[in-house]
Amino acid sequence: MWGGRFSAKPAELMQAINVSIGFDKRLWAQDLAGSRAHARMLMNQGVIASHDGEEILEGLARVEDELLSGTFPFRDEYEDIHMNIEARLRELIGPTAGRLHTARSRNDQVAVDFRLWVRDACDRTVGQLEALQKALLTQAEAHAESLMPGFTHLQPAQPVTFGHHLMAYVEMFGRDAGRFRDARARMNECPLGAAALAGSPFPIDRQQTASALGFDRPTANSLDSVSSRDFALEALSAASITATHLSRLAEEIVLWTTPMFGFIKLTDAFTTGSSIMPQKKNPDAAELIRAKVGRILGSLTTLTVVMKGLPLAYSKDMQEDKVPTFEAFDALELSLLAMAGMIADLTPNTENMAKAAGAGFSTATDLADWLVRTLNMPFRDAHHVTGSAVKTAEGLGVDLADLSLAQFQAIEPQITKEVYAVLTPAASAASRMSYGGTAPAQVRAQIARWKELLA
């Protein structure tokens, strides 16, 4: 491919560090798509003869058959997927294969291949996120009224419903899907035709190849086209945020399955045992999802560091863009699929959840709110009175609802027996009727909205 300039073969170590076919073979479908679009454009523009173009297209179809059947002969001496396919095309149809590279460089070829792959990965990820959201919606709808403690600092804070808690993740994953859609929209420009860096002297039609490959338009600057990998960085950023959300949900699943919490139960399908402790049933799927964020965020860091000091245009450093991107999306796909399966698999222990919902004086804020509404007390004063009530109850070893009216009135004489109506977890949750709140009616409204969005 470039032997005319060289009189000796590269050293074995040079070949070893330079070859990329071991990982970029994953781009074969994208490479074929780009080559077909390029060949048809060259024919239409009269850059190559129609009979040559048709021979090339027929040869590419034969190459595709070999790739699909697993009989394609990948060879390290051809370095990468582009030259492997071109070399095989030459073996199948002869020297006409050499016309395919007219008005094209490997620089714009790999740019379009990789952009197509990342675009497809974004589309797949959106579908996987939506499947996870639907699994969460199913559980949330079944448990729109199931009480559980809401936490701050992992301490009981206020009663919420299990459905409301799960809907928080539906929102997070919805934003994640939006980030992938946004990244896709920005990357949907075709770099093919930029050639090495300066464009092509041939009368090519870049809009034709862009349209053929499903892009909105060609990239506007040939130098930027082959120099940039920000489309992959943006996709990896979205992947890292998604993995962070998955890790948080996984951590809660790990906590909730412990005997100390006892909020949910996982079946054998998503747990493993111990080689020494017969009683163990470990939430390994959740733990592994929790850990995957390290690999995914590491991939973003890797590619950022690769790109940070590169002058324009292409440098061989950019060959290192693919492995971290492939690994990140492989890990993310597995995590999303496993999480969706685990969410569908889990069974909440609503009795334990409801019992825990009232722990830690979780209705204290409801008492303070009652003092504000009923006695027209400034909230800071109500906060102080409620704190005194909590201190009294704690000293007696009882809950707020177990204090007698006399004990309440010893703290604040204006308190009446009506206060007891707000001191149950169910009443607390039901009262949170503000938009987006945990009241079952609000939770059902959130569920209905997302069902419509995901329909």
Swiss-Prot record:
Pfam families: ASL_C2, Lyase_1
Domain of life according to the entry: Bacteria
One GO term of the biological process aspect: L-arginine biosynthetic process
UniProt KW keywords: Amino-acid biosynthesis, Arginine biosynthesis, Cytoplasm, Lyase
Pathway named in the protein's UniProt entry: Amino-acid biosynthesis; L-arginine biosynthesis; L-arginine from L-ornithine and carbamoyl phosphate: step 3/3
GO terms for cellular component: cytosol
Gene3D superfamilies: Fumarase/aspartase (C-terminal domain), Fumarase/aspartase (Central domain), Fumarase/aspartase (N-terminal domain)
Root EC class: lyase
Primary location group: cytoplasm
Subcellular localization, as worded in the UniProt entry: Cytoplasm
Catalytic activity, as annotated: 2-(N(omega)-L-arginino)succinate = fumarate + L-arginine
Protein name as annotated: Argininosuccinate lyase
Source organism (scientific name): Caulobacter vibrioides (strain ATCC 19089 / CIP 103742 / CB 15)
